[in-house]
Amino acid sequence: MTPGQRRRCFGLLRSAGDVWACVLEVNAWRRRHHAPPLTGYQELCRELSASGPGTFAELDTTGARSVLRRFSDAWFAAAKRRKAGDASAGFPRRRRGLVPVRWYHGTFTLDGHRVRIPTAKGTPGLWVRLARQVPYPVEQVRSITLLCEGGRLFLDVTAEVPITVYPAGEGPDPARVAGVDVGIIHPYAVAGPGGEALLVSGRAIRAEHRMHLADTKARQHAVARRAPKPGQRGSRRWRQYRARTRVVEGRHRRRVRQAQHEAARTVVGWAVGQRVGVLHVGDPRGVLDLPAGRRHNLRLRQWQIGRLLQILTDKATLAGITVHLVNERGTSSTCPTCHRRIPKPRGRTLTCLHCQFSGHRDLVAAASIATRTPGGGPTTPTSPVVLPGVVTHRRVGRHLPGAGRSRRDPRRPPGRREGPVGPRWPAPPTSGESLAHTARIHNTPPDSW
């Protein structure tokens, strides 16, 4: 991308931010005059048409309307959350410098590694070369979105992909239901209807979070003395540090996101192999409202529950599998055999003090989740819980730096030494004599010294 193309792309994003700011100013004026705000998409478009052409530089009408659609969706989403009782949900009232712009099918042109981004009437066309070719046919692409993340420009492509078609007798069976328990150490623990189970380990993701926090702390401590004071302009070295910080943050997000996609793909592939047609996923978002201390709140913030659920739902829907969110309350502290409450285990093994049942905590929870009813219902299992017998272990995040086996891991095979590893120091004499000093033994006569 040439500097001119980059400048024009950022100009489109800034113009979209101007559209967002104009909507905020109009609603602020209406609020001061005790008038209802403009929130509907149609009335916002009518207000936009009154501004006239050329108001927002090179941003065309389609791109400006996509910003209005984004504002309207954000407003109604906040209203829905407030109506449901979430007092922390806030309406969009803050200005944004760069706002993503979306263009729909028929307004842009895809030609191999190039794409023509539509601009305002009377301005030259903006052709941008892509880093790689779009992996979908042109007729399946429905929209493109220009956005900026970490100081880098991206083009998000939305395509209409058909649902997978299976041969007769090999597709997902709606009568086969599996339970999925979402966690931190194990992103997904799945219990199948026939006693099969899948355990996806995400310890590499946790290690990536810890390494990123340690690296961030070290970098901030190193440059804290050179940081500009409030009201001062940063030096060139400070700008370089900020650029490096954005690069590291973006790399960390991409690593974690790739590992999350690997975990969801592993679950969906396993479910397709087991012909599972319905996934009952435990909804753990209720724990976010519980105060759990500084350290555990950090783990919950790094968990990214919503993204894990969204990725799994998207991939399962594409494979023809239905996903239902169910209440997971008490699944990790209820015995699946005698249905009695037991102390929540601190480790990974759940043991019942009443019937002496023992099993993996996450897999037992997944087996109990499979019996729950979507949309509510009793938490006590109404049907027998199918306990997992054959467990398949999978790891995600092998591309992460901390994914290697620990040196203290007892499963680490002992190293084999093929001959000497190097020259000894000091080298032994050729005569075979020892280089150690002669020992002085006190019970020997002095003549023998």
Question: Which residue stretches match the model-derived regions?
Answer:
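Gly/Thr-rich phosphate-binding beta-strand-loop-beta motif of the actin/hexokinase/Hsp70
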Residues: 1, 172-192, 312, 362
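A short acidic-Thr-Gly-centered motif at the start of a beta-strand
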Residues: 153-176, 350
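Phosphate-interacting basic helix/loop segments used at nucleotide- and nucleic-acid interfaces
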Residues: 157-165, 251-272
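Short glycine-rich phosphate-binding loop at a beta-alpha junction
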Residues: 267, 276-284
